[in-house]
Amino acid sequence: MGQIVGYDHAIVGAGLSGLLLAKALVDSSARATGGRPPATRVLLADPRPAGRLPVTFAHWVRRATALDAWTVGTWDRLAVVAHDGQTHRVALDGWTYTALRWDRARAALMAELAAHPRVTVVQAPVDAIRDGEASAAVRLAGSWETARWVYDSRPPVPVAAGTRGARRGVNLLQTFRGVWVQTQDEAIDTSAATLLDFSADDGPDLGFSYVLPVSPRLAMVMAVRMGEAADLPDPLPAVGRVTGGSAWEVVGEESGTTPLVVPGLSRRLGRRVLAIGRRGGRARPSTGYAVTRILADTAAIAASLDRHGHPMAVPPDPRWQQGLDAIWLRALIRERAALEPAFLALFTRAPVDAVLRFLDGGAGPLDIASVVRALPPGPFLRAAAEQAGATIRR
């Protein structure tokens, strides 16, 4: 007698990738059964309560997405500010830069899934995953639960440079701290979101701020730093450029740390286990952008299940893209002073379509050629030579 499998799908982690995938699975099953109760059984495990901390995501889109209900601001122009304060504005040519409140979205999606008759939500960590031939299992709260397919979205573990299994051997941290600022007067310019502002950062690592002006009296000012230290940057020096001399107060705060890691392992972690989200390399290693890639990956997994009966037929990232990510990260480490001109060049010398696809990881060869032509060659040639040497030594 065969083993009884408790679930069709077990999703480890209820972050962006886990929740979007869970919703896509039950929605797809409902469509397949013609509106009757779906047959798919989903287990969703995460130790974190819903909506615990405020989190705002920003990304660019061309069409409607499953996250639109939680949008708090949209812009069709971006601003890039140099260290000397000079501002460059860029029209997005059909793209829309969108800010969404992920804490609100997560709370709503968690509630929707928890109320679904075919979804089991468990607030507990998964401390082990066991692969198998016909099913896999996850261990949570001291017991094993079986599923036909397991999706692991737990945070990736950085692989130290030079160790066995390190494909590229480059790891950095992206730390960020932001404040929601409310002004007394209608003093905030909402015509463009500021993607990169280098004018208020003098730290040793690459640092900048970005601004999401959601109304004439309310904006998110976020300071970002990319380096090897985990210290949180200070967003307050950048507030003055946003408030225009008006009195202001902080009405909310956000902070966090994201590893910028070039993945060293296959997404297929076993016969029945697939890495998703950041663990599956869906955050662009060289930039940290993830939302657009996770939306696309969710659709690809659902399509693989529909067409092939398994979730593994998802397109891999090209090897040349992984190589570019490693070179970009090495340049961030070694060439901090040269990286500000590089970022500015992206938005002043390359087509915006190519730049946005490059930052999200969806660029093709022609996009890459446009980006490479726009960048100052010195820092990246030196980083490429160093990366090539590291690869040869391994």
Residue map of PLM features:
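A conserved beta-strand/loop capping segment in the N-terminal third of enzymes
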Residues: 59-135
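FAD-binding beta-loop-beta segment adjacent to the flavin cofactor pocket
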Residues: 201-206, 256-275, 281, 285, ...
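N-terminal FAD cofactor-binding segment of flavoenzymes
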Residues: 24-28, 35-85, 104, 177
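N-terminal Rossmann-like FAD-binding beta1-loop-alpha1 element of flavoenzymes
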Residues: 2-43
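Short, well-ordered alpha-helices that flank and scaffold nucleotide-derived cofactor binding pockets
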Residues: 23, 27, 31, 111, ...
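Predominantly flavin-linked oxidoreductase catalytic cores and closely associated redox partners
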Residues: 24, 112-249, 260-265, 279
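C-terminal helical "tail/cap" subdomain of flavin- and related membrane-associated enzymes
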Residues: 302-394
